[in-house]
Regions:
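A well-structured
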Residues: 1-318, 603-605
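C-terminal, non-catalytic "cap/extension" segments appended to globular domains
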Residues: 17-20, 27, 33, 123, ...
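Short pre-active-site segment immediately N-terminal to the catalytic Zn-binding motif
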Residues: 320-325, 375-396
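Catalytic zinc-binding patch centered on the HExxH motif and its immediate surroundings
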Residues: 321-323, 356-378
Length: 605
């Protein structure tokens, strides 16, 4: 069932009043929380789940191919209505997480849906008990049913790890007071934090944005204030992480999952060895990527050692003028149009139809995401737009997701959903198109240098930083398996990966050890973060193919996006002559970043 299929931005620093910033119009989902359509859908959903259970529980093995197709289509229809309701409740909540009414509405909807859909738990379990030969026979008898084979393959990949029907129903029922409740506690705590910087009270999003201000004293004040507030709340955040890691360990143990990462790899439809090859390639490249770049940046900033508040500092030669919303829109749409007019046309709808919520507001969820909602409606994009060049890239990134989600919707609800590893492809590609357009338009070497440095920095944040995050999670879950972790122990794990990834030029201020505590991915989606590095590496390799002048590239690229979750990564990449399971594949993507750092170093001579 659709729970939370937001696709997050890896390093968004987001939002403010830069022209007329758009707000969502959620009426394409429902007119309001008491809309008659919503009540009707809840009633329909409840009855449909009962009917589905009555018609199919204990009977799947007896169905012929046509009957099996009917069952799949009925399940898909239920999935759409459940997804529509939760999308509406979730998006309203993200607009104002501090509103108790919105929080209650989301929680009540989650409770109702969980209660109704518990009756469907049997379906996946019973389906997985079908004999392989019998299933193959059914698929060969009905082409419409055979279209769903990728969905069945993913379901059956879970077969070795499924529990008894009764246990599965219990876990499904109990989830609302388990991980979901701790997620909500985290979200509401983060949204309620207040950071006082230069006499101004700010939410987290606006506070972290100060870390990329031109003025060094402002950056330092922001870093120290963030550290102070996080420190005050560390015991609560440590409790959240301890509980969620233990919750995961218990379920993994019962399911006999070999590692804490297995569940994520299965849902990403990617093999552990592919992720391992990616992780090892990135860690081996730390010295020639992040260490080398930050040493160069220290020189530009005139510093012997970098402090943590210098990591995202703009260059001294950087123009700190802000980009208004209209200019940002024009920049991204024209970059998309040069690659493909169709891509720009799809993206344009997000602006004209109120599918974007862009302003920073008190109580609004931090960060940026694209939410696909359901295939019968359309995606929504959330930003916290503050007019920085980074925010323009975030817009390009999230619109890439949006375009991907619109195109993949043609597959229908069950086949449209793209695993995270491939979901980042269109977003990072959208960023790359926007960057290349800006780079081509650079009028002076200085402008080119600023753009290159910005892109390298963004790639380091997407690749190096996210793999360091992945290592942090791996170490955290391994340590938690040995017993409860104190805040100091979690802090120590964080500092070990930060030191390794950022390199010797950094000195870490007292208090930086708590900065793990505000990163939502660790809480919402364990081991999600390697998907960013996967996506970046993949796009760099794809972009190299595009630059080599493949005349059919656009057509192949659109086919890849339209495929949604209907193909495995090996099948999707084959038309481009790429293979992610080859360890050398990742070096190809990393060498693009390295080449940009080479160019920056050459500019010093």
């Amino acid at each position: 069932m659709l729970n939370d299929t937001r696709v997050f931005e890896a390093n968004s620093q987001g939002g403010g009043a830069f022209g007329d910033l758009p707000e969502w119009d959620l009426s394409d989902l429902y007119a309001s929380e008491d809309a008659a359509e919503l009540q009707a859908d809840l009633t329909w959903l409840k009855q449909s789940c009962i009917d589905f259970s009555n018609d199919y529980e204990g009977k799947l093995a007896q169905l012929n191919a046509d009957e099996m197709l009917k069952a799949v289509e009925r399940y898909e229809a239920i999935d759409i209505i459940a997804g529509r309701i939760m999308s509406f409740a979730g998006l309203r909540y993200y607009q104002l997480t501090t509103d108790p009414e919105r929080a209650k509405f989301m929680s009540d909807m989650q409770d109702k849906l969980t209660e109704h859909t518990t009756k469907l738990v049997f379906y996946g379990l019973e389906f997985n008990r079908l004999d392989e030969e019998a299933l193959s026979k059914l698929l060969s008898q009905n082409t419409a049913l055979a279209r769903y084979k990728p969905v069945f393959d993913r379901m059956r990949a879970m077969k070795p790890y499924q529990l008894s029907d009764e246990m599965e129903k219990f876990l499904h029922d109990q989830s609302v007071v388990g991980a979901t409740a701790w997620n909500r506690l985290f979200d509401e705590t983060i949204a309620s934090l207040v950071f006082t910087i230069d006499g101004e009270d700010l939410p987290l999003e606006a506070a972290t944005n100060k870390l990329s201000e031109q003025d060094r004293d402002t950056r330092e004040a922001a870093a120290r204030e963030i550290a102070r507030v996080l420190r005050e709340n560390t015991s609560l955040f440590a409790r959240v992480h301890n509980t969620l890691a233990k919750d995961k360990e218990i379920e993994d143990r019962w399911r006999k999952m070999p590692t804490p990462q297995t569940g994520r790899h299965l849902s990403n439809h990617v093999e552990a060895k592919v992720v391992e090859a990616l992780r090892n390639a990135v860690v081996a490249a730390y010295p020639k990527l992040s260490h080398r770049y930050y040493a160069l940046k220290a020189k530009w900033l005139g510093l012997e050692t970098m402090q943590i508040w210098d990591r995202n500092a703009p260059l001294p030669i950087e123009d700190d003028k802000l980009v208004d919303w209209t200019a940002a829109q024009e920049m991204v749409l024209s970059a998309y149009a040069e690659f493909s007019p169709e891509m720009a046309e799809i993206a344009k709808q997000f602006f004209t139809k109120s599918w974007i919520d862009a302003a920073v507001k008190p109580g609004k969820a931090p960060g940026a995401f694209a939410h696909p909602t359901v295939t019968t409606v359309h995606p929504y994009v959330m930003l916290n737009y503050l007019g920085k060049p980074d925010d323009v890239m975030t817009l390009a990134h999230e619109l890439g997701h949006g375009v991907h989600q619109v195109l993949a919707a043609q597959q229908g609800e069950l086949l449209s959903s793209t695993p995270l590893t491939l979901a980042e492809t269109a977003s990072v590609f959208g960023e790359m198109l926007t960057f290349r357009k800006l780079l081509a338009a650079a009028k002076t070497p200085q402008e080119r240098k600023v753009l290159l440095a910005g892109k390298v920095e963004s790639m380091i944040n997407t690749v190096v930083r996210q793999i360091a995050f992945y290592d942090f999670e791996c170490k955290l879950h391994a340590a938690r398996a040995e017993g409860e972790l104190t805040p100091d122990q979690i802090n120590a794990i964080w500092m070990s990966v930060q030191g390794e990834s950022l390199g010797p030029v950094f000195e870490f201020m007292d208090g930086y050890e708590t900065f793990w505590s505000y990163i939502p991915h660790f809480v919402h989606s364990p081991f999600y973060v390697y998907a960013y590095a996967f996506g970046d590496g993949l796009v760099n390799a794809l972009y190299a193919v595009y630059e080599e002048g493949d005349t059919e590239f656009q057509a192949k690229y659109f086919d890849m996006l339209r495929a949604g979750g209907s193909k495995h990564h090996t099948e999707l990449l084959a038309p481009f002559g790429l293979d992610a399971s080859d360890p050398k594949f990742w070096d190809k993507g990393l060498s693009m970043i390295s080449a940009m750092i080479d160019e920056l170093e050459a500019m010093e001579d």
